[in-house]
Swiss-Prot record:
Annotated region (Disordered), positions in chain: 113-183
Domain of life: Eukaryota
GO-annotated cellular components: nucleus
More details: Plants over-expressing OFP7 show kidney-shaped cotyledons, round and curled leaves, small rosette size, late flowering, reduced fertilization and round seeds.
Name of the protein in its database record: Transcription repressor OFP7
UniProt domain OVATE: residue ranges: 230-289
Native organism: Arabidopsis thaliana
Tissue specificity as recorded in UniProt: Expressed in roots, shoots, stems, flower buds and siliques.
Amino acid sequence: MTKRFKLKISRILSFKSCRLKDPSSLPFNPVSSSLRRTSPLVNSSADVTTVPQRRRSSFRLHVLTVFGCGRSSTPLDVDLRNSPVLSPPQTPTFQWESEGKWHVIAQVTEEEYETPRRKIYNGGSEKDNRRRLKKKEKSNSRRRGSISSAEEETDRESLLPSSTNLSPEYSSSELPRVTRRPRQLLKKAVIEEESESSSPPPSPARLSSFVQRLMPCTMAAAVMVEGVAVVKKSEDPYEDFKGSMMEMIVEKKMFEVAELEQLLSCFLSLNAKRHHRAIVRAFSEIWVALFSGGSGGGRRSSSFSSVRLSDYDEC
């Protein structure tokens, strides 16, 4: 079987190049070169013996027609000019496998070597997309509504008149209604409070009375200094407190008794108790230096006599 197939392949290759294409020059019953080689040898004087012609296979005839060789080449060419274009006949496909020996096997279907299909995720139609968007919008609106309702419940305030007396004679329709305060009013109230807190402080001459009524001592000190209190490590706190007090008195021109007392209370509130004795000593020296001379010195010094150093002993 393998030898016959090899012979057929050699014949196919030999027919690729034809010597003559003119039908007049071709013999009536052509014989292939391979058949001539296999035919028995005869003498020139003897009669020529004719070899029985073998029937050509359909595969061989198809190869001859494809390569344009043989008897049917020219009439086909003549007919094709006037006839419509015909599609070539389908040839059987073969697949080769090497398993020690070459042999022909049947055609392998695509299903055996078919690659696994991949999952195709369709984007969906426009209707599905619209439905999804509507669902998302509804869920978001519900969340917003729940949050806003919770906030509004916190903002509700019942406005009930104090003069009305609720008796059992009043029906449910006559009861005062619960009203809601809009958020804008709340925001305005917050803004007004912030503007009042950020308003500029009064002048230093009015600080003594204004600070005592409204602000703690720490805030009064910050307003008087118009700056920020600085933390400083000092080896001699007495001299440092004395120098800082003198600078503030000279810069702000604080020569009134109320202003000086406010300055002392601010220093005491901003510092720890262990520094109170040094603060009072420094302030007492400044007080004596300012009000020791003159007729009003005794009266002003008596007002400061209530402050005693024993009250500010170190802890």
